[in-house]
Every structure is written in C-alpha cells, then in structure tokens.
Amino acid sequence: MAGKKYREAATKIERFRDYELAEAIEKVKEVTTTKFDATVDVAVKLGVDPRHADQVVRGTVMLPHGTGKTVSVLVICKETKAEEAKEAGADFVGFEEYITKIQEGWTGVDVIIATPDVMGQLGKVAKILGPRGLMPNPKSGTVTMDVAKAVKEVKAGKIEFRVDKAGNIHAPVGKVSFDSEHLNTNIVAFLKEVVRLKPSAAKGQYVQGIALSSTMSPSVKVKMDKFIS
C-alpha cells in the first residue's frame, strides 16, 4: 500500500491530464518529498512488439547536462590500453583479474567498457553481466579501441536505453535539484533520439505515452504531440 506522503503527492497531480513538459517537470519537483536528491526518470510507452528483432529499440544518447550521478566505470583491456583508460578517468582498469572477480560475484560498477580483443574472454562472464545490463556492446559504444573517448562520454552523461518486453523504455534524465531548463533539455534530447530510432517495422502510432517521475514519486503524464512520429 502506498505511504501517506505518496498519497498526498498523488492528490496534487490531475490523474487524467497530460501536462506540457515544462509543467510536468515543475509538478515532479513539487511532489518529490525524498530527503536525498532524487533521480528524475522518463518512461516512454512505444507501439512496438519487442518479441520481433526488427522492432527492438535500443540506443544511446548524450544528455547535455549529464545525469547528476557519479558513474563508476570498469575498463577491461590489455596492458597497452590501461594507461589511456586510467588517464581518461576510469575507476577500475584491468583484464583477467577482473574477469575472475566477476566470476566470483563482483559487479560493483555502473558501466563496463572493453576492447574488442578481450571480448572472447569476457564471454565467460556474459551470463553474469547480461542480466545486469553490464555486458559491453559495440552498438552502445562500450566495445571499442578508443577507451578514453568511451570513458569520457559515459562520465559526461551518455546513457544507454533499451525497450523492455512490455514495450516501455525507462531512462534517468537528471536530478530533482537540476535547473528546470536543464532537465527539459535532457528530456528533449532523450525523446528525440527515441523517435529517431523508430523501427521501420513498427505499425501504427509509435509513441503511445510519456510519463515523468522521480524516485518514489507518482508519475506525471506528458503531452505527446511534439514527440509523436
């Protein structure tokens, strides 16, 4: 059952109303009651059937104002790339010792970047990393020889997103403490990329719903007209 604060917050939102994005941002800020700096999330309902490979929507986007979160990064590479990764700001850098650590159950990072020449060995831990969304992937730019660029992008606010089985995409787009304009810019950048990635196999209306919420807050529906494609 929802807590008292959540129920009180929900009364401040018109349930059947779609808010303009700027209004929705202010509403989420108003109803967030957490003592910590809550993350703002966007949820997008898409008219796709992710059971079909040609309707899977996945991608990355650079949020202009970052996520507000300190992202911890592990780079798995051979010695020749290790210094480059460290200088770019990677929190952990290594090769076989980290594969062993992961096999033993360690997954204490937000993002893993790997060079192509270690992907064979990384396959040993794919079953551990895959379900946690940590397996490096060339499509998301986390399998690359340019480890410095990849580390800097992730640290600066590059996020990865993927449609789930129900046809929804969720993404963190900043913190409640962010300036409203900065949140707006981040959200628009994310939504534009989702729209750009519309699969040609998708039938009917592509964007079917957009909602904004923060950690432990009710969600606020957003008007879709500017983002329907």
Curated annotation (Swiss-Prot):
UniProt key word Transport: no
GO molecular function: rRNA binding; structural constituent of ribosome; tRNA binding
Gene Ontology process terms (BP): regulation of translation; translation
Source organism, top-level taxon: Bacteria
Classification via InterPro entries: Ribosom_uL1_bac-type, Ribosomal_uL1, Ribosomal_uL1-like, Ribosomal_uL1/biogenesis, Ribosomal_uL1_3-a/b-sand, Ribosomal_uL1_CS
Annotated function: Binds directly to 23S rRNA. The L1 stalk is quite mobile in the ribosome, and is involved in E site tRNA release. Protein L1 is also a translational repressor protein, it controls the translation of the L11 operon by binding to its mRNA.
Oligomer and partners: Part of the 50S ribosomal subunit.
The name this protein goes by in its record: Large ribosomal subunit protein uL1
Organism of this sequence: Chlorobium chlorochromatii (strain CaD3)
Gene: rplA
